[in-house]
Regions:
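A short small-residue
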Residues: 7-12, 188-196
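Well-ordered alpha-helical scaffold segments within catalytic/enzyme domains
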Residues: 1-18, 83-96, 161-172
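Extended glycan-interaction surfaces of carbohydrate-active proteins
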Residues: 36-156, 178-194
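Glycine- and acidic
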Residues: 17, 144-149, 160-165, 203
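C-terminal structured "cap/appendage" subdomains that terminate the fold
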Residues: 197-204
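Short, contiguous, pocket-lining structural segments
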Residues: 20-23, 27, 78-79, 155-156, ...
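Extended, hydrophobic alpha-helical segments in both membrane/secreted and soluble proteins
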Residues: 1-8, 31, 35, 159-163, ...
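Hydrophobic, small-residue-rich alpha-helical packing segments that form membrane-like cores
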Residues: 2-40, 44, 50-53
């Protein structure tokens, strides 16, 4: 984890362990560069599925390649930058290319925010319905897997708040408030308990 490496570097410097601090810095720089080069698809970071035997990336566009079930693949995940939001809170700075991070946050809002769930199909738990709005766990602007991970069609407040905080750090105040206000409107005291948000309240 890039955030852990940055934190370890700072702790090593505090403990005057220059050797380990340098090692952490080197690993971070290589890892950060690798993530931007291999996982960023121009709009967001995606999940590269690997062969469990060889650990090589599977070609998800090859119809002859068997893709394991319950994966994310090329989906846009709502909390793909949760580590970045935590790094900002801890004063660790950016874990990847700043422009890529900002582009990803914009893509999460673009692809995952739904203004009206009246026609949204969800085979799992429904924490949002009807004309309510929210951020989906995942969307597939580049094509969905045949058997995606189970919770992609849900909305969970904990993940929405994390994404909104990430947006605030990237200067997307209007989008962040749109997400937060959507949560609060769903938990208005009439439809749901305003003091116990599902996935962010007494459920955990």
């Amino acid at each position: 984890d890039m955030g852990a490496l940055k934190a370890a570097e700072k702790m090593s410097i505090a403990m005057k362990d220059k050797s380990f601090a340098k090692k952490c810095r080197t690993l971070f720089e290589k890892g950060s560069e690798w993530m931007d080069e291999n996982l960023f698809n121009g709009e967001y970071y995606e999940h590269k599925i690997t062969d469990p035997k060889t650990f090589e990336f599977l070609d998800m566009n090859d119809p002859d390649v068997k893709i394991p079930g319950f994966q994310l693949g090329q989906g846009c995940l709502v909390d793909q930058l949760v580590g970045q939001y935590m790094a900002h809170l801890c004063g660790l700075g950016y874990l990847g290319d700043k422009k890529n991070i900002q582009t990803t946050m914009k893509s999460i809002m673009k692809y995952n925010f739904v203004e009206d769930f009246s026609r949204h199909f969800n085979n799992m738990r429904s924490y949002v319905m009807g004309d309510e709005a929210g951020l989906l766990m995942a969307s597939w602007p580049k094509g969905r897997l045949e058997v995606p991970f189970p919770y992609f069609s849900e909305v969970m407040t904990g993940f929405e708040y994390c994404a909104a905080v990430g947006m605030l750090y990237e200067g997307m105040e209007e989008d962040a408030l749109t997400c937060i206000n959507a949560i609060r409107r769903r938990h208005d005291g009439a439809k749901r308990n305003p003091f116990s948000e599902s996935e962010c309240g007494h459920h955990y």
